[in-house]
Amino acid sequence: MLTIALSKGRILDDTLPLLAAAGIVPSENPDKSRKLIIPTSLSDVRLLIVRATDVPTYVEHGAADLGVAGKDVLMEYGGQGLYEPLDLRIANCKLMTAGAIGAPEPKGRLRVATKFVNVAKRYYAEQGRQVDVIKLYGSMELAPLVGLADKIIDVVDTGNTLRANGLEPQELIATISSRLVVNKASMKMQHGRIQSLIDTLRDAVEARHRH
């Protein structure tokens, strides 16, 4: 049995056509189903529906053999028990710093609000900046507006939400897309099956970008 961990939303919607190219079609619509374990058209493949931030945990600990996770999540997670064999080139966006439009660069210690705490610490350590990182789970744009933080680090798609709240994207930390991740033990135990799936998905990604 191969178990693939996916999260609902944009990543799931963009991954399903790639899985379909490998003959893997869920038995019911994951967006509408309340089930968290969904069989597929292949009797030896099932899908796990989990939170996006939990995909690497399920895969690293072997509860899932494979998963699809955004590079932002993988950068924050920093898991060592994962292979990352394929960039699926879906759910593209940017991980950026942002601050109030026209605000001067703060002097001294910087306060940064983000859910990407590890990424923020690494990024500013590489710059030699002293920072206080404030963990938030959502509505990052609010933090600079009410004086909680000088800057935020967040995923940016169009930047419209930032601008609507008087903020502007500033420094690019990373270009983000979704990646296929594989449990290291599963790759050894089921190498032929998983490598075949990786090759099929790679072909599907390349075909999608040829058009």
Swiss-Prot record:
Leading EC class: transferase
Coiled coil location: none
Any one GO molecular-function label of the UniProt entry: ATP binding
Pfam families, per database record: HisG
Superkingdom as given in the UniProt entry: Bacteria
Annotated localization: Cytoplasm
Chief location: cytoplasm
UniProt GO BP: L-histidine biosynthetic process
Family annotation (Gene3D superfamilies): Periplasmic binding protein-like II
Keyword Glycosyltransferase included in the entry's annotation: yes
Role, per record: Catalyzes the condensation of ATP and 5-phosphoribose 1-diphosphate to form N'-(5'-phosphoribosyl)-ATP (PR-ATP). Has a crucial role in the pathway because the rate of histidine biosynthesis seems to be controlled primarily by regulation of HisG enzymatic activity.
The protein's assembly and partners: Heteromultimer composed of HisG and HisZ subunits.
This protein's domain notes: Lacks the C-terminal regulatory region which is replaced by HisZ.
Protein name per its UniProtKB record: ATP phosphoribosyltransferase
Originating species: Pseudomonas aeruginosa (strain ATCC 15692 / DSM 22644 / CIP 104116 / JCM 14847 / LMG 12228 / 1C / PRS 101 / PAO1)
Gene: hisG
